């Protein structure tokens, strides 16, 4: 119980409030997670989910079994309103034994992962290597396989290469090989969604995209064969998971923290987004536990957590939930998600990517200042990439995505690869993410107004 004594000694701190934020409450919550009874509980919670069920591809039994398992655990935890809501007509794509082979100037089976959603197709053609996206407008790609060998500038900047199928198909291209979206590789191609299911398309490992680039620069003729056996199947129904801590005064106003439970069909889906799930669960568990002995932690508004399905397929699960609830009696007061690595922030390059008005941003800044006082370095940065909660953000609901400093590059070493395993996380990563999400939920569920 040393942590309790330490907290009592700190009650004399001159920094009990930071604007509208009660720093003593933030300190109590964050220390309970980082140094108290909740330490490492999120990581421990995550282990059976990813080890026992593995990756959780949409429309697969592993996902639906993991949903059932998670719901039962949440009920045992005593949360309010634990239930699932169906998300029908979800895209159902099955990866096959796909191959891409360099035929000229030598024979080499290339290391690829088919881009999600692509239908079966075979094509053999000459390839043209482009180092920049804009070159599609000045290069003859008609009848050719387009190979992109771009330099890494960032995921959101480079995602256009993986999604180029529709545009290059309109120019006559017959196939797409996109350099994987990441700054580092050990022969590890990345998967992800594309833009046209009818054009054979795959992601190349960084090493082999650069190999093809070197061959092209030496004026070698490249001939490549693509054989896609993956296929689209009839749509399925999946489920979002919802659980609450009911508000004591304004239960119809909802503060949302969220992550997604589905993953691609590779690795364990621990990084993307099992860690986010664990952090959200840990934040909710801590607020509930503290509220049982300290009335300050009984939220006035309802704190809701959602584990989304079908995030990897265009946020389809979240979009369906939004459509079902947008005209309901509940009012979403604040929305958030963590889906870019549940890592410990080490510098103020770690951000809360924020959408909202000037007044709301100022209040978010006060929350950040309180986190900093509790040794959690972070800053607020405006940004319109809000993932699963984008629909609410577009409606004007203030929103946040947590992105740790390691989320900009290190996260993409493993993102959408076979290397997405639990051992990526280090001690404290999920705890710190939970402390951030828990602070947001606690403070905003109790403030008077924006």
Cite the ranges covered by each PLM segment.
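Alpha-helical metal-binding/catalytic segments enriched in His/Glu/Asp
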Residues: 75, 241, 257-315, 437
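Soluble metallo-hydrolase cores and metallopeptidase-like ectodomains found primarily
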Residues: 25, 105-109, 114-138, 191-270, ...
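Metal-dependent peptidase/peptidase-like ectodomains
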Residues: 107, 265, 308-412
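Noncatalytic luminal/extracellular "stalk/propeptide" segments of secretory-pathway proteins
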Residues: 31, 35, 47-145, 150-152
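Extracellular/luminal Protease-associated
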Residues: 60, 109-200, 268, 378
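N-terminal signal peptide
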Residues: 10-22
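N-terminal capping segment at the start of a domain
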Residues: 20-60, 186-194, 262, 334, ...
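His/Asp/Glu-rich mid-to-C-terminal helical/loop segments that flank catalytic regions of hydrolases
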Residues: 285, 410-450
